[in-house]
């Protein structure tokens, strides 16, 4: 009996303790709900609320970028954008280069090569025209012209022929060097052999000046056409 009484008494004490702790917690929650837990955001009468809100707004504005196009343009607007620059993006890739983009060294070398080729071409055409005009129809006419020619004119024509032959050989040597250094990609050994035989035939044609003259003029014309198409 005493044991049962002791157990009942212990149960009552635990129930009282639980009820007291529950009442204490409920009172504390009600007090926090009415007064706030020290956070100025829950207390509308606190003077720190406006300062906290402005600080949060500043932080948010600093962290988040502006989404509008006007703000983006104002941020990244350059000071020199007001100066007229013209239609920069309207220029095509294949348009001729501007003055500031041209390399003066490359331009000078190309101009000098064009001048040399033009002078050489004019000399060859002049020599070719003179030879065609002065060539007789038969051997009798050739003998008469040779007998009637003065020594001064013969010397002059000999100098012109010599100068043209020297220029022709110089251009031919340069052309042969450039052709020998070229290696065609994907070319078979047969094609390379054909190319080497064509170079040997060109060397053999050195003894025939008119064939050589025609070939050199064709090369110069092709180079001039390529440059005109390029620029």
UniProtKB/Swiss-Prot annotation:
Residues 36-48 have a biased composition (Polar residues). Residues 127-145, 156-166 have a biased composition (Basic and acidic residues). Residues 1-24, 29-48, 127-166 are annotated as: Disordered. Keywords: Chromosomal rearrangement, Methylation. The modification Omega-N-methylarginine is found at residue 113. It comes from the Eukaryota. InterPro entries: OFCC1. It is linked to A chromosomal aberration involving OFCC1 is found in patients with orofacial cleft. PANTHER family: OROFACIAL CLEFT 1 CANDIDATE GENE 1 PROTEIN. This is Orofacial cleft 1 candidate gene 1 protein. It comes from Homo sapiens.
